[in-house]
């Protein structure tokens, strides 16, 4: 018996090093994911594509056929170039590889409306797939540079992003280049994690010069780099205001400023003669508050509330008297309300001009800017006191959140600006899983109206449903449990479960409504009902996620230490 026990004991001692060695030698590669995903994407080549396809085709033509000083002036097509210079250079680069057969197909023609066939479609689809390798490379570096204990969880995060339903729907069906652009942004996040601050600033500056929507994340980067790389409080003792100069590491500040200014100079200096036109293209405030399809944010709820109040006021005259006391800008009579409804674009006609509300006060770009700025300040203040990677990503996520929730003319596709940074947070604490799953499920489902044809319904529904089941479970298994060692169930979690359960019947109901509209003419007057249901229900999920993350970020200090 003694010899037997000794052998068992010896076996246990030998198994521990073997387990460690297995973890060390296991390769977490995204290569197989790229191969499998590419097969699916190639099968989607002949399918639906949006007007964004002709947008990018036109940009290929502009950058290929015209001199650089005409790029932001050309307006033959309504799809004018309205991305920053690096993306224009990117389009020019792609245009150099257009085969003769594709050029003859109309790919490089500057015309009012593009006329092209399968060769152009195949070429442009391939450019999206190949450019997405930047995203795979960035996430592979993220995995490879992780500690052994983090690799499994970080592999789940990385694979969840490369297989994102958002990228499949928006890039490989609808048509855009978000995978490539987020690859550059994620490279900056990975550099921040590895404390490569100059590289972090460089990648973010490059991302910003590719797509200006990343400007919403700039406050988090600015405060993080300032606090982590430029300011040093380790030996600071305040005796006079002159001592404040000593906390600045001037050499680091100079290096940081040189890199950022160098990248922006490279991007914008060639367009110095047309800078006014360039800025007008990048920031078109002539567009309305909401897009044709309301993005699931605060203004969707605001628009819906205005429509409900309009109906109630017309049916209940006494309610109009009560509301007019509080809302001084409200029309005084029912006739005035009808006039405003007829004369104004009230937010459901699929237009991009100014949106006017009937009952509620009008929203201005200035108000949306101030609301966004206020909540972003709240998001970055904690980073001043704790410039850790975890705090930085939390701040980054909240900056993306508030820009999506309160921004002017926000597109539903911008939800990925929140989901992807949030993905990097989940492994740190399982309590973050509930707000993340709310955001991801609501956010990805809110993209469904982009693919409005019935033939695409099963693909978008099943792919998103399977993704949610697999990755919500995997993240729950790999994320860290809080210090108490027990997963605490909050009332918030129970409400989230109810939300998930109702999400599926909501999607099925809207799809049934869409199918029946083609059979029954009486349903034509409810043309925008399905979009409104999507927008409002998904808004509830996104807003709930923001509230949950904000609470944990600001009031659960142990989570971030």
From Swiss-Prot:
Predominant subcellular localization, coarse grouping: endoplasmic reticulum
Transferase is among the record's keywords: yes
Bilayer-spanning residue ranges: 28-48, 126-146, 155-175, 206-226, 253-273, 367-387, 392-411, 432-452, 457-477, 495-515, 528-548
The protein's annotated pathway: Protein modification; protein glycosylation
Cytoplasmic side: 49-125, 176-205, 274-366, 412-431, 478-494, 549-561
GO terms for biological process, alphabetical: dolichol-linked oligosaccharide biosynthetic process; protein N-linked glycosylation
Enzyme class (EC, first level): transferase
Top-level lineage group: Eukaryota
Keyword field contains Cytoplasm: no
Any one annotated GO CC term: endoplasmic reticulum membrane
Localisation: Endoplasmic reticulum membrane
Topology feature Lumenal, residues: 1-27, 147-154, 227-252, 388-391, 453-456, 516-527
EC number: 2.4.1.265
Lipid bilayer topology: Multi-pass membrane protein
InterPro entries: Glyco_trans_ALG6/ALG8 (IPR004856)
UniProt keyword list: Endoplasmic reticulum, Glycosyltransferase, Membrane, Transferase, Transmembrane, Transmembrane helix
GO molecular function, one term: dolichyl pyrophosphate Glc1Man9GlcNAc2 alpha-1,3-glucosyltransferase activity
Catalytic reactions on record: an alpha-D-Glc-(1->3)-alpha-D-Man-(1->2)-alpha-D-Man-(1->2)-alpha-D-Man-(1->3)-[alpha-D-Man-(1->2)-alpha-D-Man-(1->3)-[alpha-D-Man-(1->2)-alpha-D-Man-(1->6)]-alpha-D-Man-(1->6)]-beta-D-Man-(1->4)-beta-D-GlcNAc-(1->4)-alpha-D-GlcNAc-diphospho-di-trans,poly-cis-dolichol + a di-trans,poly-cis-dolichyl beta-D-glucosyl phosphate = an alpha-D-Glc-(1->3)-alpha-D-Glc-(1->3)-alpha-D-Man-(1->2)-alpha-D-Man-(1->2)-alpha-D-Man-(1->3)-[alpha-D-Man-(1->2)-alpha-D-Man-(1->3)-[alpha-D-Man-(1->2)-alpha-D-Man-(1->6)]-alpha-D-Man-(1->6)]-beta-D-Man-(1->4)-beta-D-GlcNAc-(1->4)-alpha-D-GlcNAc-diphospho-di-trans,poly-cis-dolichol + a di-trans,poly-cis-dolichyl phosphate + H(+)
Similarity annotation: Belongs to the ALG6/ALG8 glucosyltransferase family.
Function noted in UniProt: Dolichyl pyrophosphate Glc1Man9GlcNAc2 alpha-1,3-glucosyltransferase that operates in the biosynthetic pathway of dolichol-linked oligosaccharides, the glycan precursors employed in protein asparagine (N)-glycosylation. The assembly of dolichol-linked oligosaccharides begins on the cytosolic side of the endoplasmic reticulum membrane and finishes in its lumen. The sequential addition of sugars to dolichol pyrophosphate produces dolichol-linked oligosaccharides containing fourteen sugars, including two GlcNAcs, nine mannoses and three glucoses.
Stated name of the protein: Dolichyl pyrophosphate Glc1Man9GlcNAc2 alpha-1,3-glucosyltransferase
Species assigned in the record: Kluyveromyces lactis (strain ATCC 8585 / CBS 2359 / DSM 70799 / NBRC 1267 / NRRL Y-1140 / WM37) (Yeast)
